[in-house]
């Protein structure tokens, strides 16, 4: 499988509906604990550009355990959030328990019954590529009120310093060669920019605005390995292969990095207006 951050729509036809529903179920708790949050600076900027006022209703597609949800909910928006994984859905409900105007539904976007022109914004954070584009964009547009906005937020895969990567590369070559490619900042920026183009190419959206920033995070080795376990290429590994890889990664990290590892990632959004 190609890297999670390369925009390939995950070859969704290769997976059954049930497989797509449960893909992250086994790592829902790890996802909740380890995935980076979306910077509030970007959240505020998205709210500004989408012209969301206090009465705006947001439809979130693929909310996961509520990683982006709580950021928008904290700004007092009403939200209907769709999440196909039962495990992630339950975590999202726990994380959003203090926000009475947030409803989390255990359902796919495809199965969800369309509520036409109800929403000021359709929000999806590192999730919309799981939906076939010929379904996702038209349905999102139909759910939006006139001049409503599609907000696609993305966190690209966290990358260690190149010196650390060189150490880990040797491990990947032994245990999982397909996962050993280093994504440069330029590569991540290119992949990020390409994602926004799909919305325009759908013929249902216009006036694309894209912004991004570089984020830096320090992880303990345990937390970094937990983070890796939530990325799709690692989920796809056979259990024995994954266990061997993670044991070797841990050994290399503890030997060369001490107790923590510094990583960086590109975080950003694409906002497009309904035609």
Language-model regions, residue ranges each:
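Class I SAM-dependent methyltransferase SAM/SAH-binding core
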Residues: 57-59, 65-111
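A short acidic, Gly/Pro-enriched loop at the edge of an enzyme's catalytic core
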Residues: 112-122
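A short SAM/SAH-binding and catalytic strip from SAM-dependent methyltransferases
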Residues: 120-134
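A short glycine-rich, Lys/Arg-flanked "PGG" loop and its adjoining helix->strand segment in the class I
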Residues: 135-146
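Conserved catalytic/acceptor-binding region of the Class I
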Residues: 145-215
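Conserved Class I S-adenosyl-L-methionine
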Residues: 3, 65, 188-275
